């Protein structure tokens, strides 16, 4: 009997899977995001990341952006993803130039990760920079709740 239990228990555990959070749609073009923002009267959440070199950015994706809480809050925003990778081959030349322009315009301190909230008129409403990589996302969630 113990043998059967020891045999079947690992099989049962293999069958368990975490249900991933629903994916959100990040736009990659500022003009498109602003157009939708005006149409839907929603603020734009701009996320500046260094996807291939920034450890806090990678952790923030896992700890915040891949959660059900973020999925629900994201419905209040138009989402704009601005990647500044070290490997420029990850982006087209056009996307690289677009992202660099927004980086210079909206991320003047050059910090990563950075969340910037823009009004439908394109004005900066608020910013939140950094991530302590501890799994603590309550400050980010409060920021998103406050600025929707």
Task: Put a short name on every predicted segment.
Residues 48-50, 82-85, 120, 129-131:
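Active-site-proximal beta-strand/loop segments in catalytic clefts of secreted hydrolases
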Residues 63-64, 104-148:
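Non-catalytic, surface beta->alpha helical segment in thiol-disulfide oxidoreductase systems
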Residues 40-54, 79:
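Short active-site neighborhood of thiol/selenol oxidoreductases, capturing the structured segment around
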Residues 24-27, 70-97:
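Thiol-based oxidoreductase modules, predominantly thioredoxin-like and allied folds used
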Residues 1-19:
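Bacterial Sec-dependent N-terminal signal peptides
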Residues 56-73:
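Typically the conserved alpha-helix immediately C-terminal to a functionally engaged Cys/Sec
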Residues 26-44:
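A short beta-strand-turn-helix
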